Amino acid sequence: MSDFLNVPVTLIGASRGLGRVLAETFHAKGAQVFVVARGRESLDALARDLPGVRTLACDATRDDAAARVLAVQEPRVLVLCGGAMTVNIAFPDLDWDRFNVSWETDTRISFNFLKAVLDKPLKPGAVVVTMSSGAAINGSPISGSYAGAKRMQMFLNGYAQKASDRKGLDMKFVSLAPARIMAETELGAAGIRDYAVYNGVTEAAFLNAMGPAQTPKDVADAVLTLIGDGKPGGNFLVSAEGVSALS
């Protein structure tokens, strides 16, 4: 799949940040873009900026969210990029409820939507993309359960692919982890600020030590490539050097 003209694309959590860049990318390709997010205000702004994009204000962590979303549009491409802002506090200073936020948002969204498309399969050839994080590989000591939650998304992606293959559903499941924090997103800017404080350095020094980072556009381009390359699903990492498969 390389031509996205009139292809139904549903994005979960795409009213801002990386998700918005993905929405802009698919819109520019002529796709039938449907964006789901919690915030009505940010959705209205996106709809004004991207004429023709449909939106739905919905808490994607709710048990009925997947059924509501899939009833509006059956996607040929489903992208799960929703999640919570990280707490950015070292874990000894967190209680369990604050520590656990990413499990109850990012992972729960993946759990619910992956189950839904396996219970009521999308049409053959459909692709489901889960946005994970490089934190799933390297950890993130001031982000609560974020690293573990993003790692679990990778596992769920693999489980979903195996379940699809066993049922002969001809669906492709892909997870993509941006390797570095991206200053261009709200999540990334907050992480850079708080990690600089945590390490006792300036933001510039933290970024310099981190090395070159991929941009949101790099990530969007990687998503398009993984959807259209005709290869099996799997877990992938995107960095400033390009896309690589994760074992």
Model-derived features: positions:
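Rossmann-fold scaffold of SDR-type NAD(P)-dependent oxidoreductases
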Residues: 12, 75-83, 106, 130, ...
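Conserved glycine-rich cofactor-binding loop
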Residues: 15-16
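Conserved glycine-rich Rossmann-like NAD(P)H-binding loop of the short-chain dehydrogenase/reductase
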Residues: 29-45
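Rossmann-fold cofactor-recognition segment
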Residues: 49-63
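Conserved mid-core segment of classical short-chain dehydrogenase/reductases
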Residues: 83-102, 119, 142-145
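Catalytic Tyr-X3-Lys loop
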Residues: 92-111, 129, 153
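Catalytic loop of short-chain dehydrogenase/reductase
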Residues: 127-167, 177-185
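C-terminal helical subdomain
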Residues: 196-247
